[in-house]
Amino acid sequence: LKDESKETFDAKGLTVLPGCIDTQVHFREPGSTDTEDLNSGSKAAVMGGITSVFEMPNTKPPTTNFEEFDKKIKLGERMFCNHAFFFGATAENYLTLEKLKDLKGCCGIKLFAGSSTGNLLVDKENDIEKVFEHASKVVAVHSEDEEILKMRKKLIEKGNVKTHPVWRNEEVAMSSTRRIVKIAKRFNKKAHILHITT
C-alpha cells in the first residue's frame, strides 16, 4: 500500500482480519432475485465490513448437482467479495457428495435436518447417515428435529413473530444436534451446527 495512514495500531500478537467472514448468507440467486442477488448481496456485505461469504444452496433451483453448482460459480463472477458456495444434500444425491473434496468454490455440504425455505429437507436418520458416510467436506447443518417441529406447529400464532422461538425451541435444536453429533462421530466426519437456538 502506498497511502500513509493517519493512525497506526499495534497488532503484535493479535489475529488481524481485513473484514469479517459470514459463513451463512442467503442471496437467493437463482430464483428469488426480487429480494436480493449475488451482486447486490455481496455489495451489502462489503459495505457492512464482511469481506468473505459462504452462500447457501436453497435457491430455485437448488444447488444440489454439478450443473447447478457450475451455474452458481458463473453467477459468482458478479460478486464484490470473496465467496464460496455450499452444495445442498438431498436424500438422493449422497453418492455425489463423495466427489466434492476438490471442487473449486465449494465450502461444504449443507444439510437441512429441519424444514426451512426450499425443499432440501433430509430428516430421516438413514438418509442423514448416508450424507455423512459419503461426505467429502464439512457438513453444515440446519439442526432442528422435524418430528418435534411438526408436533409443535400448533404453537404458531399467525402474524406473531414472538411465537417463532416458542415453536422452534431449544429442545427442537438439541434433539437434532445430539443425533447429528452421534452420526458425525460414527462416520468420523466434521459437522458444523448453524444458527443454534440459545
Stretches found by the model and what they are:
Residues 74-89:
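A glycine-rich helix N-cap at a beta->alpha junction
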Residues 1-3:
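N-terminal metal-binding scaffold of metallo-dependent hydrolase/deaminase domains
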Residues 6-10:
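Conserved beta-strand scaffold positions in the cores of enzyme catalytic domains, especially
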Residues 19-25, 53-55, 83-87, 107-111, ...:
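Hydrophobic faces of well-ordered beta-strands that scaffold small-molecule active sites
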Residues 5, 50, 80-82, 105, ...:
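A generic structural signal for alpha->beta connector loops
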